[in-house]
């Protein structure tokens, strides 16, 4: 079966955790797009009512408006009931690599603002150890780029400036740049996260550690739901 189908199935199952009256975080990326379309359908047919969403990117905001999903802000809803988003890699402890969609800063803020963070993914995103397949995105301010490149390389990464389809540097919604860092398998994600955060000029990184409450993963054998007993929020 098609990987797109698995992502759509995971998104549909994750929507079962949304209840009427909730304020929720709306993720960014292909799986999140399936979730947005499913959410719009449930709002349109009355299965859900009075749901408002905080988008994690301008891209998500545009699609949500097109679909008629009511939007809000963290100023109005600083505490969210739920956040739904995809992931680029998921390990057995529900530690994640995110950010290939370029929205990891807002995604992390929204996930941290939610009582529960539910990750939706196809089985292709499951790994034994983070870094097996994906680079680690690191968002940096333009002024700090040279320093960040040196420091990230010293940590064992191979930083590559992300560019858009035209070949120009990719610019995030916050006006920053992204270095896709190829570390290979990450032996100690917590230590690496701390080291990256200590680099002046780094705004955010794509390691989401201890944040996911539940992962909804779809594959050829159906859907599995993995809970993380040591997540910071249940």
Curated annotation (Swiss-Prot):
It comes from the Bacteria. Pathway: Carbohydrate degradation; pentose phosphate pathway; D-ribose 5-phosphate from D-ribulose 5-phosphate (non-oxidative stage): step 1/1. It is an enzyme of class 5 (isomerase). Substrate binds at residues 28-31, 85-88, 98-101, 125. The active site is at residue 107. HAMAP family: Rib_5P_isom_A. This is Ribose-5-phosphate isomerase A. It comes from Roseiflexus castenholzii (strain DSM 13941 / HLO8).
């Amino acid at each position: 079966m098609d990987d797109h189908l698995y992502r759509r199935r995971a998104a549909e199952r994750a929507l079962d955790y949304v209840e009427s009256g909730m304020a929720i975080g709306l993720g960014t990326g292909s799986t999140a797009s399936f979730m947005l379309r499913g959410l719009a359908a449930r709002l349109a047919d009355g299965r859900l009512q009075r749901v408002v969403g905080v988008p994690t990117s301008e891209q998500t905001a545009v699609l949500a408006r097109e679909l008629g999903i009511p939007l809000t802000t963290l100023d109005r809803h600083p505490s969210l009931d739920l956040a739904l988003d995809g992931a680029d890699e998921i390990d057995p402890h529900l530690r994640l690599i995110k950010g290939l969609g370029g929205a990891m800063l807002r995604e992390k803020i929204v996930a941290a603002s939610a009582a529960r963070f539910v990750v939706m993914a196809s089985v292709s995103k499951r790994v034994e150890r983070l870094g097996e397949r994906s680079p680690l995105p690191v968002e940096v301010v333009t002024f700090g780029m040279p320093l960040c490149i040196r420091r990230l390389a010293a940590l064992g990464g191979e930083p590559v400036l992300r560019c858009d389809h035209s070949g120009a540097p990719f610019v995030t919604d916050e006006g920053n740049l992204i270095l896709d860092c190829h570390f290979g398998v990450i032996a100690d994600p917590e230590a690496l996260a701390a080291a990256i955060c200590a680099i002046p000029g780094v705004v955010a990184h794509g390691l989401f550690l201890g944040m996911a409450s539940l992962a909804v993963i779809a594959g050829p054998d159906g859907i599995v739901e993995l809970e993380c007993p040591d997540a910071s929020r249940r």
